[in-house]
Structures are given as C-alpha cells and as structure tokens.
Amino acid sequence: MNVINCEEVKRDEFHTEKYYESYNIFGAHIVTEDEMRGVRFTVWAPHAKAMSVVGDFNEWDYEQHKMLQVTEEGIWSLFIPHIEEKEIYKYAIETMAGDVIFKADPYAVYAEVRPNTASVVFDIKGYEWNDKNWSRKKKKKSVYKEAMTVYELHFGSWKKKEDGTLYSYREMAEELIPYVVEHQFTHIEIMPLVEHPYDRSWGYQGTGYYAATSRFGTPHDLMHFVDECHKYGIGVILDWVPGHFCKDAHGLYLFDGTPTYEYKDKDVQENPVWGTVNFDLGKREVRNFLISNALFWMRYFHIDGFRVDAVANMLYWNKEGQEQSNEHAVSFLRELNEAVFAEDEDFLMTAEDSTAWPLVTAPTYEGGLGFNYKWNMGWMNDVLKYMECAPEYRKYIHEKMTFSLLYAYSENFILPLSHDEVVHGKKSLLNKMPGDYWDKFAQLRLLYGYFFTHPGKKLLFMGGEFGQFDEWKDLEDLDWNLHDFEMHRYMHDYFKELIALYKRSKPLWQLDHSPEGFQWIDANNNEQSIFSFIRQGDKQEDALVVVCNFTKATYENYKVGVPDFEYYNEVLNSDAEQYGGSGQVNKKRLKAIQEPFHNQAAHVEITIPPFGVSILRPVKTRKGSKKQDGSKTKVRSNVTSRGKR
C-alpha cells in the first residue's frame, strides 16, 4: 500500500474531488520516517476539538499522543515511532462539547475479535497471490452469456466444528471449496464480512468497512480463501452495504460528536427499518470513503463482485408518508458503478432492489444506474406465493407464474432464492411446499426445475440444495444430518444433476438477456396448471422444451407443440425414481408428429408426471421447415428487450 504523507496531499482533494485511494491516506500505516520505524495514524474528524491516539502502548492515556490537524477541514495525523504490527488502538476525540469519546478507526484493516472493539495495526501488504490463471480466464468470458450459479452463504453458520466454534477463513477453504466444486456452482456469495459487533446482524450493520471480520482470522487468511476459490474456478461475491451503518458507540455514528458520516438532518439520518443511520451520500468525503472501500476490496482481496444491499432503501428517502427519490443516492450509485467498471469491466455489480426504478442495469451513459445485474425480487415473490398455494387453487393465480416474462428483459436479472425467504418465520423452501412429505419434495424438485429453466442467472441460499427442513438458524449450522434420510439424499442427487444439466445446456443461459432465448408454447393452461416453453441458444439447433405440471395429476399422451425436429429425448424428469419420484417418465425416444400444435410446426405426446418438470432435447438438427410465408421456422419471443449493457 503506497502511503501518502498528509502534508503532501493537495489540500482540498479528499474534501472536494473524486479521490478513490483514501485508504492510502487514512488509517494506521507501518512506515519509516526520519529513519525510525513506526506507525502513521491519520483520521478525518471535521468537528473535533482535539484528537489523540490511545492504546496499550500509552496505557490508554489520551494526553500522551496528541494528533496534529493538517487541514482546516479536519484531517488529523500523527507518527508514533516503535509501534509494531498487532498493536491495538483507538482514537480519543475531544468533542466541541468538551466530552472525550473513544472510536475505532474507520479505515482500520483489522480489528479485535468481538466483543472487544479496538482497531489493530496490521500490514496488509505481503500476501502473494496465485490467481493469474483465474484472471486470464475471466477476461475471456462474458458475464452475460455464460452459465451463472451462485451459492449464497453465511460464513458463520454454513458449518461449525463439533464443539460449536467457527471455522477460520483457511479452514473454510478446505471445507467449503470442495463442496462448491462438487455442486458445480460458479460463484459463492458471502453475506457481509466487514467487521461488525453483533453476530445476529449477519454483517449488515458494520463498524469497520475496511476490516475483514476477525471472527474468522486475519485479512491474509481471507485472501488465502479467495485465492483458493479462484484456483478451483469459483468467483467470490461479497455482500456490501453502502446505504446505512450501525449506531454502536465505538463506530462511525456521531464520529467526532457530530454527524460526520451520516446526514445531519434527523428526518433523513435515521433508518427506522433497521435502527441504523444512513450514510450522507451527498458529502464528498463520505463518497470517497465508500468508493475507495469498494476498490480496496477489489484490489486487495481480488473480489469478483458485490451484491449491493438495500438499494431500494437508498433510492428513496425514509420520510414517513413520502416516496421521494434520493438524488444523492442516485448520483452516488452511478459514480460508484463508473469507478468499479473503470477498475474491472468484468466485475459483477448486483443491485438488491425491489422497486420498479427503471434502467437499474443500464449504463450510466444511457441514463441508467450502471449496475450489470439486479435481483429479480418480483419473480421470487410471485413464484413463492404460487408454490405456497394449495395445488387445487393455483389455477386462480396462474398469472403469478407468467407475469415475470412481461418484464424479463427490461433488466439483466438474477433469480434469487435467497436467505431473506427462509428466515424470520417464513419457513424453509421445502417446508413452504403444501401437502404431505412426498408432495413437499416433489414440489421442491419442480420449483428447482422451473428455476433453472426460467431466463435469468441463478442464486440459491445454502441448505436449499439438499432440502433443509427447518428455516435458517443463524446461530447454528446447517442440518447436515439430513443426509441420513433417503428423501434428502434423493433431493441432493437431483439438485446436482439439475445444475450439471443447466451448465452443459447453452439454451438455458446463452440468451438469458435476449427475448430470442425464450418462447411460450402454452402459457394459458390454468385449468391444469401446466406451463410449457422453449429455451433457445445462439444456434437454432440448440433448443430445449420444458413442461411443468404444478398439480399432482398425471397425464398420459399429453400433446405439446415443439419446434420441427424429428425426434426428442427426455433429458431430465423430476419424477424419476432415482430422485424420489413415482417414476412417471418418458424413457423412449419421442417422435415428433408433423402436425402443427400450440403454434409450433410439430408436436409430441408425452407422459406428464405429478408435480413434475420434464425437459426435452431434440435429437436431430432442424429440417429447415418452411412456414406459410416461405421463411424458415425460428424460435422467437413476443416480448421486447431493452438490450444488454
């Protein structure tokens, strides 16, 4: 890290200009000055009356190591010789009211393990990365036209040791990575790893934005974890929270005794949703703090993406009874995304946004917010409501399963089956399913089949892959003992086969963001709650036919319109006995009958299983059949696309 001496910094740069290397100025840096080794401490506290550095080295006496104010706008700095790495410290701040408060360093790269709250001097330099091959391979791929399967996890509750203690970053590399590789996930998405005092905030209420939480080890240990992920071809996405922060006394809240990182106006300062305070995104120093932080994680931890939390809460003010857009946040998000993509054009910037704000994933030069992905919260809510409904009543809410295709190409979407839907009394995905024991597993297999064949990249929260029965319990690990039960083993086998099929089937991801990649065969069979559609790849011969039955009825010789290929094979049936189903499968090759049906040139007659999904793949290339106007048959959607980034 290239530490910049404060006296050499242009006086107003941090305060008035875009300065995205603020971590080079602020924090605690091990340096040599005047031939003496020590630590240079620098902090921004614009309304402090006086500042000092305290720690074990001076018995926490705030009179000993007074800091020098080096800019009128409140940058303070001090070099203390003979202090070494691992020294704990805080800033003692004399406020304008005459009080002395003690704060952790906003730019510290390491902190004490909770419940202790001091910052720790740490030399973040020195880790030797081994992921050049990963970087080269990533450059050759498009984030839009590749398969993407994201495994969302909470680091502290995926798995614990027998004595209930946490695995370290290095130990998790040994435990987690082989599991992720076995399941063929392309990425892991980790809930926030910034330092945070309260375990049950899951990291979303942070105090140390530059400090990887010490619960699991040192920053270098986390670098090793990311390095190992890259070694095995796994991308790493971090949850990141630039909208709000916690009110713990040692953190950013009222940092110098006055609103510093948060809004001054009480009406917009408080975030009543989480009991936190909102970052003042109109303040240049706060923007530089946050955007520098994003680039810090990219540069020093080689992170491949951010899932930006609570974008909806940022875009609109929290004022009661009002829905007024926050132009500070809009401008900040655009600036953030421009800075991130200038650093790495292949980075993943995903917005967790439940609003109808337009052009979230459009480039800023087109008037968009500049993200390249957005969680499809509407799809998630509609589909889960549909699945929770008793099967005999699903025909009355049929549109919940078709509505998403009316806007599927308005943004670049990720379909999330996330942690938010399996906690706080919402039940696990398996337990959301109505009916008896067998019905629940059959419908979860069906849901996953629909999930993997619907346009959009995929995200699943941990435990869903084997049918976790209880909802997520953040203080415990997953119920790994469920593998002792046959139906959970069947579910696990099915999920692995489904994800493998997804990854090797270009029609399921190649045109995720183009209307050319999807066509309804029959979207209107509400009486039987059966949906059928085509997924299409770049090549016309790359096509899959998907049929989903959301009731327990079995149908023999059911006619489904298909593109004009000669034969079809069933490549996956969720009702197969090896997955715990009843065995209503289509074993034989299906000959396409050359009679139009469902606006297709031909049709097949198949067995449709109860609560089942059947995926058909053409055996031979298309015969070049002609439509009545003489043109070749072409799979095409009736929805329009805004276009890709």
Swiss-Prot record:
SUPFAM superfamilies: (Trans)glycosidases, Glycosyl hydrolase domain. GO terms for cellular component: cytosol. InterPro entries: A-amylase/branching_C, Branching_enzy, GlgB, GlgB_N_E_set_prok, Glyco_hydro_13_cat_dom, Glyco_hydro_13_N, Glyco_hydro_b, Glycoside_hydrolase_SF. GO terms for molecular function: 1,4-alpha-glucan branching enzyme activity; cation binding; hydrolase activity, hydrolyzing O-glycosyl compounds. It catalyses: Transfers a segment of a (1->4)-alpha-D-glucan chain to a primary hydroxy group in a similar glucan chain. Pathway: Glycan biosynthesis; glycogen biosynthesis. The keyword Methyltransferase does not apply. It is an enzyme of class 2 (transferase). Residues 636-645 have a biased composition (Polar residues). Keywords: Carbohydrate metabolism, Glycogen biosynthesis, Glycogen metabolism, Glycosyltransferase, Transferase. GO terms for biological process: glycogen biosynthetic process. Residues 619-645 are annotated as: Disordered. Catalyzes the formation of the alpha-1,6-glucosidic linkages in glycogen by scission of a 1,4-alpha-linked oligosaccharide from growing alpha-1,4-glucan chains and the subsequent attachment of the oligosaccharide to the alpha-1,6 position. This is 1,4-alpha-glucan branching enzyme GlgB. It comes from Bacillus cereus (strain ATCC 10987 / NRS 248). The lineage of its organism: Bacteria, Bacillati, Bacillota, Bacilli, Bacillales.
